[in-house]
Regions:
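A solvent-exposed, acidic/Ser-Thr-rich amphipathic alpha-helical stretch
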Residues: 29, 33-97
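Short, low-complexity N-terminal intrinsically disordered segments enriched in polar/charged residues
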Residues: 1-36, 183-186
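A beta-strand edge to alpha-helix "cap/lid" segment located at domain peripheries
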Residues: 70-186
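Short coil/turn segments at secondary-structure junctions
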Residues: 2, 48-49, 107
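Generic signal for short, ordered secondary-structure residues
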Residues: 8-9, 40, 62, 102
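Charge-dense, low-complexity intrinsically disordered segments
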Residues: 5, 51-55, 110
Length: 186
């Protein structure tokens, strides 16, 4: 049995919103993508690549995200997604593969700590839409690479022209002016 198309698309949007919000440093928005009773299970690299640390609820997710504050910039590239219905209506499972870059600057040297990882997810449909109810992050491999140059992150923590809010999975309308038209022209 497979997940309904509309549910699969909504859950996939949730996964990508998470990656985008983390990369844009919008950690309060990340928290809202989880249920109030969610469990986030994380590894403790390099000691353990398996999920051994547990964070519970919104406060736990917020604490986990605070650890990224010391990282200059991140980029989460979702490279694989598998979704399946759970054992009840409004419950779904996901296995997400990702390459996560963590760029840091120390002593004028830029380093990219790359995690090749997998998220094993549980999703719940809530009145606010689909949310992450459980996430276990497993690291499959870690690389460290020198980097020549790194674009500075935006100071306001927002993606340029992204038009998305993690709290709402709907794109926000952009105020644009088509070429050759004045704002008064319909």
């Amino acid at each position: 049995m497979s997940l309904r198309t509309s549910d699969r698309l909504a859950v996939a949007d949730l996964v990508h919103l998470y990656a985008s919000a983390v990369d844009d440093r919008r950690f309060d928005d990340v928290v809202e993508l989880f249920t109030a009773t969610a469990e986030l299970r994380l590894p403790d690299p390099p000691r353990s690549l398996e999920p051994v640390r547990r964070h519970h609820g919104h406060d736990g997710v917020r604490t986990a995200m605070a650890a990224l504050a010391s990282v200059t910039r991140t980029e989460h590239a979702i490279v694989g997604e598998m979704y399946a219905p759970g054992d009840s209506l409004g419950y779904a499972l996901g296995r997400i593969t990702c390459i996560a870059h963590h760029w840091t600057i120390a002593d004028d040297q830029i380093t990219d700590l790359v995690w090749h990882l997998r998220y094993d997810d549980e999703y719940l449909r809530t009145p606010a839409g689909w949310r992450i109810h459980g996430r276990a992050l497993t690291i499959n491999a870690i690389e460290t690479r020198p980097v020549r140059r790194l674009r500075a992150p935006k100071s306001d923590g927002r993606a340029a022209d992204a038009g998305l809010s993690a709290a709402s999975t709907e794109p926000q309308p952009r105020k644009t002016n088509p070429r050759g038209r004045s704002r008064e022209t319909p």
